[in-house]
């Protein structure tokens, strides 16, 4: 067992509700991933701020991985040097403690691994100092609702789940009224399948 693990990718980290949902489930190890090899050093700087802030706020370790493109791959993607410049830098593979400290040496270029032992007592130590989902959260005033119920991409005005119409036959394609610009209006003559409301 390694602890409670949560994960977000790239700019999902700028959705505070998504991050808070993981905090509220008491993640201890947060796995994050950013593409890397793009935009330059500013992207790596933004990434560092983001993962260190989440580590502090969540009182969790953050294990961050970034991709890396070598020069051969960059040349295959971008035909000109001007475009290739946007595919360099911006990488920061690192592990951050719940106190916001980077463990060991981060990897900012090339392929490789960053490995560290995680002392999970630091999670408790940080939460004793400040717990974002503890009393500090003021749940009597503010709380996040996660609706895990199954949803449909469409509902009718009555609130009932939609029912599909039966398939149209080859013969019907030759007899449809082509004078109307509304193709759905041409389907009204079909009989809805069992359980579907009449149109």
Q: Which positions does each model-derived feature cover?
A:
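C-terminal beta-strand edge segments of enzyme domains
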Residues: 66-199
């Amino acid at each position: 067992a390694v602890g409670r693990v949560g994960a977000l990718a790239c700019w999902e980290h700028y959705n505070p509700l998504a991050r808070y949902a993981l905090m509220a489930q008491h993640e201890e190890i947060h796995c994050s991933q950013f593409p890397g090899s793009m935009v330059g050093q500013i992207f790596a700087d933004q990434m560092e701020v983001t993962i260190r802030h989440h580590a502090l706020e969540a009182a969790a370790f953050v294990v961050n991985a970034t991709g890396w493109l070598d020069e051969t791959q960059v040349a295959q993607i971008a035909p000109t040097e001007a475009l290739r410049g946007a595919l360099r830098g911006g990488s920061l593979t690192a592990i951050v403690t719940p106190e916001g400290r980077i463990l060991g040496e981060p990897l900012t270029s090339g392929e490789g691994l960053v490995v560290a032992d995680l002392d999970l007592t630091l999670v408790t130590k940080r939460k004793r100092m400040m717990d974002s989902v503890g009393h500090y959260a003021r749940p009597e005033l503010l709380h996040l609702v996660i609706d895990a119920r199954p949803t449909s991409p469409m509902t009718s005005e009555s609130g009932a789940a939609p029912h599909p119409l039966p398939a149209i036959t080859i013969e019907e394609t030759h007899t449809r009224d082509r004078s109307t610009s509304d193709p759905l209006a041409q389907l009204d003559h079909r009989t809805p399948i069992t359980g579907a409301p009449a149109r």
